[in-house]
Amino acid sequence: MSRCISNNEIETLGQALMKQYIETMNLKHVFCMDIEGFVTDFLGLPIEYESIAEEQTGEEKETKKLGFLSDGITKLKVVLNGIVQEVTYPRDTIVIDKMLLNPEESGRKRFTIAHEAGHYIMVKHCSLSAQASFHREFDSTAVYSPRMMKQLYDMNERYANRAAACLLLPADLMSRLIRSFNKGRPVRIFPGNVLAEKEKLLIKKMADAAGTTNATLFYRLRELHLFQEHPMDEYLRECILKKGVVYAKDLPFI
């Protein structure tokens, strides 16, 4: 993309799109957004599920290509009838790897669909020519070359990731989740992004209700300033140190 887009721009676009979709489909009380319905019925983009077989050699072998947004020109390697074939999909077709149809992969599938929709929205927003794009999943345990890190953290990918999170978890929905699961209070967090088991369970419950991964829910809480940082002493007292021990700050001369 030829210009920088602010997070506020992406947030506003995502919120406006989802608000219109929610009102159109009467989904005001739903926690789990129908992202496939949003993409196919609202944006008008077809979704295909195929076994993506793009070669991943050398520096790319650690990344798995899970999704693809077609520009109508770039060929995609997929497995059809047991044979790897190059297919040119119609422009703006989203192709998702079949492995994500596994029920256990629902959160990843939904994020991948939203990510490719994010690319489409950003292209429209910036009035750019369509460009084919892949969604690669970052593996925190892998060692990436500088070139692969650049691809993974490419500006366009960051925009699409932010847009995906906004579509799956718009601000209004996040507010409803907080009201329903945490009595409207911000989620407690400690320095260094440390979470107590209670808050980890809370995030999992909200993520399950919204049909997203824990990581996506966590990032949205952070992006929307829905965390409240508490002192590390509180965490140590509650989760690490033995009860009944006298701590230095409790002594009258400290």
Q: What spans do the regions from the language model cover?
A:
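Active-site hotspot residues in diverse enzymes, especially metal/ion-binding acidic/histidine motifs
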Residues: 1-254
